[in-house]
Amino acid sequence: MKKRALVSVSDKTGVVEFVKGLLEQGIEVISTGGTKKLLEENGLQVIGISEVTGFPEIMDGRVKTLHPNIHGGLLAVRDNETHVAQMNELGMEPIDFVVVNLYPFKETIAKPDVTFADAIENIDIGGPTMIRSAAKNHKFVSVIVDPVDYDVVLAELKENGEVAEETKRKLAAKVFRHTAAYDALISNYLTEQMGEESPETLTVTFEKKQDLRYGENPHQKATFYKAPFAATSSVAYAEQLHGKELSYNNINDADAALSIVKEFTEPAVVAVKHMNPCGVGVGTDIHEAYTRAYEADPVSIFGGIIAANREIDKATAEKLHEIFLEIIIAPSFSKEALEVLQSKKNLRLLTVNIEKATSASKKLTSVQGGLLVQEEDTLSLDESTISIPTKREPSEQEWKDLKLAWKVVKHVKSNAIVLAKDDMTIGVGAGQMNRVGSAKIAITQAGEKAQGSALASDAFFPMPDTVEEAAKAGITAIIQPGGSIRDEDSIKVADTYGIAMVFTGVRHFKH
């Protein structure tokens, strides 16, 4: 008995050549709708689906393969005598190959003007049913959902006259990944349409972007996956112009740097090490901003990641070229800047659209045995809701420094303290188990520059000791959430030393 293949694809990449290869192997091809038309236009002889089902395609193609003659041919266990007898009795023929990919639901809902009706119409029913049937019976049926696998299948057919059992299993596994991802997209779309924020089950799907050399450490394996609708202003959508392949740590650090630089509308440069900012500078142009970011911590920036929110020009590139850096991220690089920076063969240069998120996306954090889901912390300082509990209010320059420090401190590992002065950070205290410890680190780093600077804290002061340390260092303004039962103690110390203090009412823990 001749082997049969059923071919019905939305993505027609390579399908003509593949079907030609099947026909050359003596395999009959059944096809539907647009796929059948394309194959026939290319001179290939195929059988219409209606000839197999004895039933016309109806309801604008919604019902064409949902028929016992199709699914009996797919699901029949060929070495089961009862199955074979029933097939013979009902005049069914086995189907040995299924070549199907699904309606473009993802592409449809990605359109800015998509309607709900359009989205629903692009939910495939017959396709998933066929490929799931075929994948379940993969011992006897080869099922191909990805054009990438066409050459593998044809090569095995030409060499061995059949597809290897291991290949069939791999193809079947791909089918169930494919349908799971497809259903997750549909589930998430409908859930969002209904405004459900915490559904009883969470379905997520990610697409493989690249294998990584290793993970956080050389003994850990790692892979980079991107969300199907990831923001274009993300590392997942960055274009690499030059340099070595990105590592696991590179991607983490680049993501952190991007998150910080998006906080600024004026020209800004951020330097990051181990996902914490070591220097942030703003200026009238990107060269001035970089100079300040570098001067913020010229030691820690070595081997760091740089993110800028303006094009890198030649003058800035020449300064960047002077030190060892892992990555430079910017919206663009001038031709002259590229010529300067590409002389370092390992330096990774990335371009990405840099724009602050207008709405909070979901942040997923894995824990042992589960997953935490929360909104990203995209909240900006709202000056209409702040309060100033101290006798003195910040000066204009202090306000400027406070705002810069507050934008940065939300991106520093808690407990976090950031000092800023004259359009740059001058001290960063990160990840300490007590707040005053982080303050001491930031103050020590700032040295004499701490005099007249502004301090930001990601959470309230449980005791007045941090304010006391700030006063000793000559810090003149503080911004913090407030809300401690001992706020009055901190306010009293601030007033004693003439420090202006701002309460935001918003905490920015980061773990």
UniProtKB/Swiss-Prot annotation:
Cross-referenced SUPFAM superfamilies: Cytidine deaminase-like, Methylglyoxal synthase-like
Question: Which reaction does this enzyme catalyse, per its entry?
Answer: (6R)-10-formyltetrahydrofolate + 5-amino-1-(5-phospho-beta-D-ribosyl)imidazole-4-carboxamide = 5-formamido-1-(5-phospho-D-ribosyl)imidazole-4-carboxamide + (6S)-5,6,7,8-tetrahydrofolate; IMP + H2O = 5-formamido-1-(5-phospho-D-ribosyl)imidazole-4-carboxamide
**Where does the MGS-like domain lie?**
1-145
Its Gene Ontology cellular component terms are: cytosol
This entry's Enzyme Commission designation comes to 2.1.2.3, 3.5.4.10
Gene3D superfamilies, per this entry?
3.40.140.20, Methylglyoxal synthase-like domain
Which GO annotations describe the biological process of this protein? Answer: 'de novo' IMP biosynthetic process
CDD domains, sorted: IMPCH
Keywords from UniProt, A to Z, are: Hydrolase, Multifunctional enzyme, Purine biosynthesis, Transferase
Q: Name one Pfam family in it.
A: MGS
Pathway the protein takes part in: Purine metabolism; IMP biosynthesis via de novo pathway; 5-formamido-1-(5-phospho-D-ribosyl)imidazole-4-carboxamide from 5-amino-1-(5-phospho-D-ribosyl)imidazole-4-carboxamide (10-formyl THF route): step 1/1; Purine metabolism; IMP biosynthesis via de novo pathway; IMP from 5-formamido-1-(5-phospho-D-ribosyl)imidazole-4-carboxamide: step 1/1
Task: List cystine links.
Answer: none
Keyword Hydrolase attributed: yes
Question: What molecular function terms (GO) are annotated for this protein?
Answer: IMP cyclohydrolase activity; phosphoribosylaminoimidazolecarboxamide formyltransferase activity
Q: Which NCBIfam families match?
A: PRK00881.1, purH
Regarding domains, what does the record say?
Answer: The IMP cyclohydrolase activity resides in the N-terminal region.
Which family does the record claim for this protein? Belongs to the PurH family.
Q: What is this protein called?
A: Bifunctional purine biosynthesis protein PurH
Q: Which organism is it from?
A: Bacillus anthracis
